[in-house]
C-alpha cells in the first residue's frame, strides 16, 4: 500500500532518511508526503493568497495521487495529524474515491470563529485546585512580564525564533497556552 501524508503545514521533517510515518511502518507501506501549499518550499512567488483554499489543497493531493497511481497501483491511505488531519478529511470530501482509507489523527473541527466547546471542557478537566494553581501561575507570569520579557526575547533570539506578531504578544500567547 501507499500512505499519502496530508501535511497541514511544512513537510521538511520527511526529508530525514530515518523518518517513518506510523501507518507506513505498521503496514510496511510506501510513503508520500505532500506539503501544504504556501508553507516552506511550497510557497509561490509572488504570493497570491486567493489560491490558499481547502479545495485547492485537495486538488494538490488529487494531482499527486494521479501522478503516482501508475507507480503505486495498490491500496492508498490518506493520513494527517491536527491540521493535516483536517486536510485528510477535506481531501476525502472533495475526492471520495482517491484513497481506500482515510485516517485523520486529532483533526479539529471548528464550528465557528468562537467555537464555544473549549471553555466547558477546560472547566471540567483536572481538579478545581489544579486549575486555580495554573491560573495563579499565569497571572503571576503576566504581572512579571516587564522583568521576564527580556529573558523570553533572549531565548527566542538564541533559538532563531521569528514571529509575525510583536514579541510582547507572543509572550502573552505562550503564557496563556
Language-model-detected regions and their locations in the chain:
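Alpha/beta-hydrolase active-site loop signature
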Residues: 10, 36-40, 109
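Alpha/beta-hydrolase fold nucleophile elbow
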Residues: 72-82
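Alpha/beta-hydrolase active-site loop
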Residues: 50-71
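Alpha/beta-hydrolase
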Residues: 90-177
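Gly/Ala-rich beta-loop-alpha elbow adjacent to hydrolase catalytic centers
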Residues: 80-84, 88, 92
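Conserved alpha/beta-hydrolase
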Residues: 24-44
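The serine-hydrolase catalytic nucleophile loop
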Residues: 13-21
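Short beta-strand element of the alpha/beta-hydrolase
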Residues: 1-9
Amino acid at each position: 500500500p501507499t500512505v499519502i501524508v496530508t501535511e497541514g503545514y511544512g513537510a521538511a521533517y520527511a526529508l530525514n532518511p530515518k523518518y517513518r510515518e506510523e501507518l507506513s511502518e505498521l503496514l510496511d507501506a510506501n510513503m508520500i508526503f505532500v506539503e501544504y501549499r504556501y508553507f516552506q518550499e511550497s510557497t509561490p512567488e509572488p504570493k497570491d493568497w486567493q489560491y490558499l483554499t481547502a479545495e485547492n489543497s485537495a486538488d494538490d493531493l488529487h494531482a499527486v495521487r494521479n501522478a503516482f497511481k501508475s507507480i503505486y497501483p495498490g491500496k492508498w491511505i490518506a493520513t494527517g495529524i491536527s491540521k493535516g488531519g483536517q486536510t485528510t478529511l477535506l481531501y476525502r470530501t472533495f475526492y471520495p474515491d482517491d484513497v481506500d482509507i482515510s485516517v485523520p489523527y486529532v483533526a479539529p473541527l471548528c464550528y465557528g470563529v468562537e467555537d464555544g466547546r473549549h471553555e466547558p471542557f477546560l472547566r471540567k478537566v483536572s481538579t478545581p485546585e489544579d486549575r486555580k494553581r495554573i491560573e495563579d501561575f499565569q497571572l503571576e507570569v503576566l504581572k512579571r512580564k516587564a522583568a521576564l520579557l527580556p529573558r523570553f526575547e533572549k531565548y527566542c533570539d538564541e533559538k532563531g525564533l521569528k514571529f509575525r506578531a510583536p514579541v510582547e504578544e507572543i509572550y502573552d500567547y505562550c503564557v496563556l497556552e
